[in-house]
Curated annotation (Swiss-Prot):
The lineage of its organism: Archaea, Methanobacteriati, Methanobacteriota, Stenosarchaea group, Halobacteria. ATP binds at residues 280, 287, 316, 345, 385, 456, 462. This is DNA ligase. CDD domains: Adenylation_DNA_ligase_Arch_LigB, OBF_DNA_ligase_Arch_LigB. Keywords: ATP-binding, Cell cycle, Cell division, DNA damage, DNA recombination, DNA repair, DNA replication, Ligase, Magnesium, Metal-binding, Nucleotide-binding. GO terms for biological process: cell division; DNA biosynthetic process; DNA recombination; DNA repair; lagging strand elongation.
Length: 594
């Protein structure tokens, strides 16, 4: 597929206001990208590009291209009379990098036009290959290599293509295409009238894409997405193997999946919903997923691919944090003798084994050097509480009670303990014991519930804390004053308000030490989009936990709400922008306070 064709469809999608219209456009695009077997790579790539990704969500590779590098590449491709400062000035006017890139005539266009010749057309496959080479650049000179590679792409671009590439490399596609729309489009494009992967028959299809594909097809696509975390792979599976292929797809050890999440609730809520309640300690730690294939067991497990895999530890964001957590690796190696995928929490502990604050855990997660020294200062302990795969068997569809029993088997009875209670008083007693031991409280789970990756449902409840906090995204900043003049001093916060959208909810400047301000400034500077005086626009990448006294309605911020007396609690390194709190939760919390 020519990249210009993809760019044109992207422009249509960005202008499409209706959800059903979006699904139809995505369906048509996937059909065009995956119409023949020769287009396998294009189908997978186009599906990922639609969601602003070059790699599957579980893949730890990144492009590692910041706004400044992108501006420099655009300036170079635009010609000798254009500087990075010129690009930044245009960015201040346009407000987003795609429009800026589309506004320049790049070198390749000018040269070919002078000779009256056409140019070698970019293809989707060529762009994907170049971006993958760019991601592979590492070590000395890697920044220069990335700049050269990006310049080469821009130099071959027409305006619409440049807009998409600039947005793609910075993770700012802004097409208004959510994961749900892509899921539904995969079902419609390849499963409507084609449930088993045979020749399609479109003679008796309805106009509604969801009805045409059918709930069964959408469920099968969703399930395959849960176990693969790869929209490109699932699109190809749906086209080539139909429902049977999607249903046959399982977990793979070494390929992390999204964590199942909890909603807030009370003991009474849990008893009324579940009857008997599984009560677990809620640890003040960082969520992890453990993948391990012992050498002795590799060949007998299809999910292991027949190869040994030393323990790999993945964060909630599916980042590989194995090297920072050697004691977790040792813990797993000492106890597990079969291939497993475990869900759990890593907690910081002192010399006596008592829990330390959450921020101590994050000090270890971020550590790439001097790990042994940090290990002496802050110890870690794994509390595994769920088992998704064991010894060749996927357990997602098994009830929690059975999964926990399997967990106890594979961990030699070292699994996190669970109690079963049938009344609120027993739950409150368990919570008091957990709090007395220095933990965060309790989790309340439906003993009969399956494990649904990425789902925040009512089968897992976390007891409401006495003081609420919000996980909000940094979308802007202001320079400090006085001795803090060279540091960001105030941070503009946003919450999720829809697909690819964030709504501002307030600014936080209280509760930060000089050291924390310096750390945040260092983290955020590579993501600066533009500056206007003391105000700075920042690409959303960093999530902060903030406390507050109350939530008020306010016309000042785009959410319609403002945090009263916000205070910094900590950086949530374990959370991505997609894990930040939603405007829906803000509205609910504001209502609860009235």
């Amino acid at each position: 597929m020519e990249f210009a064709a993809f760019a044109d469809r992207a422009e249509e999608l960005a202008a499409e206001p209706a959800d059903i219209g979006t699904t139809r456009l995505v369906t048509d695009l996937l059909g065009a990208a995956g119409g023949t077997d020769e287009n396998d790579d294009d189908l997978a790539t186009v599906t990922r590009f639609l969601l602003g990704r070059v790699f599957p969500a579980h893949d730890t590779r990144t492009l590692d291209v910041g706004p400044a590098l992108c501006r420099e590449a655009i300036a170079r491709a635009a010609g000798p009379n254009v500087t990075a400062d010129d690009v930044e000035d245009r960015l201040a006017e346009e407000g987003e990098i795609g429009a800026v890139a589309a506004g320049f005539e790049f070198g390749g266009q000018r040269g070919l036009a002078a000779f009256g010749e056409g140019r070698d057309r970019l293809t989707v496959a060529a762009v994907d290959a170049e971006l993958r080479r760019l991601a592979a650049a590492a070590g000395d000179g890697s920044e220069s290599h990335k700049r050269d590679a990006l310049f080469g792409l821009f130099n071959r671009c027409e305006p619409a293509e440049a807009k998409v590439i600039a947005r793609l490399v910075l993770g700012e596609m802004r097409l208004g295409v959510g994961e749900g729309a892509v899921r539904d489009a995969i079902a419609e494009a390849f499963l409507a009238g084609n449930p088993e992967g045979d020749e399609r028959d479109e003679s008796d299809t309805d106009d509604d894409p969801i009805l045409r594909a059918g709930d069964e097809a959408v469920v099968a696509v969703e399930r395959a997405l849960q176990v693969t975390n790869d929209y490109g792979r699932v699109a190809v599976l749906a086209r080539d193997e139909g429902l049977n292929g999607l249903r046959a797809e399982g977990l793979a050890v070494g390929r992390p999946v999204q964590a199942m999440l909890a909603q807030a609730g009370t003991a009474t809520d849990a008893v009324e919903a579940f009857g008997e309640v599984a009560v677990e300690t809620k640890f003040d730690g960082a969520r992890v997923q453990v993948h391990y294939v012992p050498e002795s067991a590799a060949e007998g497990d299809d999910a292991a691919g027949g190869t040994e895999l030393g323990p790999r530890i993945y964060s909630r964001n599916m980042d590989d944090v194995t090297d920072a957590l050697p004691e977790v690796v040792e813990y797993v190696e000492a106890r597990v003798s079969v291939p497993v995928i475990l869900d759990g929490e890593v907690v910081a502990v002192d010399d006596d084994g008592d829990p330390l604050p959450f921020q101590e855990v994050l000090r270890r997660f971020r550590r790439k050097h001097d790990v042994d020294r940090m290990r002496e200062e802050v110890g870690l302990r794994l509390h595994a509480f769920d088992c998704l795969h064991a010894d060749g068997e996927d357990l997602l569809d098994e009830p929690f009670r059975a999964r926990h029993d399997r967990l106890a088997e594979v961990l030699s009875d070292a699994a996190a303990s669970v109690e079963f209670a049938g009344d609120p008083a027993a739950i409150e007693a368990a919570e008091a014991a957990a709090l007395g031991a220095g933990h965060e409280g309790v989790m309340l789970k439906n003993p009969e519930a399956a494990y649904t990756p990425g789902n925040r449902g009512r089968d897992w409840l976390k007891r409401k804390p006495d003081v609420e906090t919000l996980d909000a995204v940094v979308v802007g900043a202001e320079w400090g004053e006085g001795r803090r003049a060279e540091l960001f001093g105030t941070f503009l916060l946003g919450v999720r308000a829809g697909d690819d959208e964030l709504a501002t909810i307030g600014k936080v400047a209280t509760g930060l030490t000089d050291e924390e301000l310096a750390d945040l400034t260092e983290r955020l500077e590579p993501h600066v989009v533009s500056e206007d005086g003391t105000e700075i626009e920042i690409r959303p990448e960093v999530v902060l936990e903030v406390g507050y006294e109350e939530i008020q309605t306010s016309p000042t911020y785009s959410s319609g709400y403002a945090l009263r007396f916000p205070r910094f609690v900590g950086v949530r390194d374990d959370k991505s922008v997609d894990d930040a709190d939603s405007l829906e939760r803000v509205v609910r919390l504001a209502g609860d306070e009235k």
